[in-house]
Design a protein with these regions (language model features):
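Alpha-helical junction/boundary sensor with strong preference for TPR arrays
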Residues: 26-30, 65, 98-101, 136, ...
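Structural motif corresponding to the intra-repeat A-B loop/turn of tetratricopeptide repeats
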Residues: 10, 48-49, 81, 119, ...
Length: 164
């Protein structure tokens, strides 16, 4: 998927689609051989295919394996289908330091920030988009420019003095 996203970031849409189609084919072949590729296919469909299909796949996977990677992917797929309130519940799980063993993912934090922005929660959105770029300023050739653009749109928080 990363190669497709690199191609997409370079404006090579046809080459990106070839990579996404190849990934779908390989994941389906692996499933026929007994592997579970629901997370891979769900992530792919959420961003580069059918988000509703991603939600379907990832809900089943969540029931089987409720980990942080699945929580992130399901939250993102829900966001992509317009279900932002439920999406935030899963994004919060995916970015919970205790549930993730203390590991922070720039992509997971980015997803949470985008979902919060969609819900007009500008303070948390700004904080999480900034955190994603701080954790890894190169986490995605597609998402880093988006995070920077969204931060610019959100602007700086208002400066308020003490009450009184």
């Amino acid at each position: 998927m990363e190669l497709g996203e690199l191609y997409e970031s370079l404006g090579l849409g046809q080459a990106a689609r070839v990579e996404y189609d190849l990934l779908r084919e390989r994941a389906r072949d692996a499933e026929e051989a007994g592997a579970n590729e629901a997370l891979t296919l769900g992530r792919l469909e959420a961003d580069h295919g059918d988000p509703a299909e991603a939600v379907r796949l990832l809900r089943v996977e969540w029931g089987r394996q409720p980990g942080t990677a699945v929580a992130d992917a399901l939250g993102w797929a829900l966001h992509r289908t317009g279900e932002d309130e439920e999406a935030l519940e899963f994004a919060t799980i995916a970015t919970d330091g205790d549930k993730g063993g203390g590991v922070r993912s720039a992509l997971h934090v980015f997803h949470r920030g985008v979902i919060e922005r969609a819900l007009e929660r500008t303070g948390p959105a700004r904080r999480h988009l900034r955190e994603a770029l701080t954790l890894n300023p190169y986490f995605s050739p597609l998402r880093v420019p988006e995070a920077k653009r969204l931060l610019a749109e959100l602007g700086e928080p208002p400066v308020e003095g003490p009450p009184g």
